[in-house]
Amino acid sequence: LDILDTFKLEKNLYEELEDMIYAEDSDYFLEDLIEQVLEHTEMPRFRLGSIEPGELSERLLKTYANPRMCPHFHMSIQSACSKTLKGMKRKYDAKLVEKSLKDIQRLVPNAYVGMDVIVGFPGETEEDFNETFQRLASLPWTRIHVFPYSDRPGTKSEEYCEKVDTVEKKRRASLLRELSSQRLREQALAQIGSLKDCILLSKYKDKSKVQVLSRDYWQMQLINLPEDFDLERIAEGEFKVKVVSFDESNASRMDGKLLAELVES
């Protein structure tokens, strides 16, 4: 299947199976869908989008034993404080957040785990924020996407009275982003020297700007490509790169170097 076929399949699966899987009386689960797609298609890569802790079953994690499942998770946790999660009307608590992250580490070791976290939700006290911060600091993950809370018209939280001051929201966001940057740097440095299967993200005439994406969601810039290298040779399918350095001027990027022997194959 080419990329277009993959997008069509994804769209059709979503439209046809969404109601069947998420209906209250449904006997079907996300795990059923993934297992069926893995069994009945030959698509080489599958990556799940945003997922909540309550959806992360052991059965789902065991599907990652299949090499076609990309070891990358985007966790929509929002907070790691049970009181704050209750205020957000989430169907899980901090214990389940903790369990889900530990389960990923246990069953899909070395996976890239990104998370969405909101700071300054109405009613979030300093103690609540510190609980989230300390809990996350002790858990396994790769990166946090931090969002200061803002009112959205028509939502229940818009009516809440205990709003957090804008300056305080920015302070909390800054602290979490610093924690995230430190963790991302540690994880990135641990990748140096490893070989990764990648796909091409962009094609530039300037060979110093070529971006690739690994199965475990590390975005890298290829370096030392010859000026006469034809990118069409790697435009379809996967190829290997060797991670050689981490550019600390941009914490979201790593530098990779193609393995010459694989490029020539």
Q: How would you label these PLM feature ranges?
A:
Residues 1-126:
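Conserved SAM/AdoMet-binding glycine-rich loop
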Residues 33, 59-60, 130-134, 182-185, ...:
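Glycine-rich, charged/polar anion/phosphate-binding loops
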Residues 49-51, 76-78, 116-118, 147-149, ...:
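Generic beta-strand/beta-sheet core signal
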Residues 51, 144, 223-225:
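Thr-Gly-centered strand-to-loop micro-motif
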Residues 71, 83-199:
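A structural motif corresponding to the C-terminal lobe/cap of the Radical SAM core domain
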